[in-house]
């Protein structure tokens, strides 16, 4: 599963990292969204 990141200011999307499991991807998204202010992380 790909975790994507979107720059909030411009809406630009970037492939961030690929995870083997949905659980790992969800955990990463939760952690990343709590620490990154200018980026929004989500699962594609």
Regions inferred by a protein language model and the residue ranges of each:
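Short aromatic-glycine-(Arg/Gly/Cys) micro-motifs in beta-strand/loop hairpins
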Residues: 1-15, 42-44
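A short, charged, amphipathic alpha-helix used as a generic interaction element across diverse proteins
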Residues: 19-42
């Amino acid at each position: 599963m790909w975790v994507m990141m979107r720059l909030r200011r411009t809406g630009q999307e970037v492939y961030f990292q690929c995870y083997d499991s949905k659980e790992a991807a969800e955990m990463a998204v939760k952690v990343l969204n709590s620490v990154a202010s200018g980026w929004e992380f989500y699962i594609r």
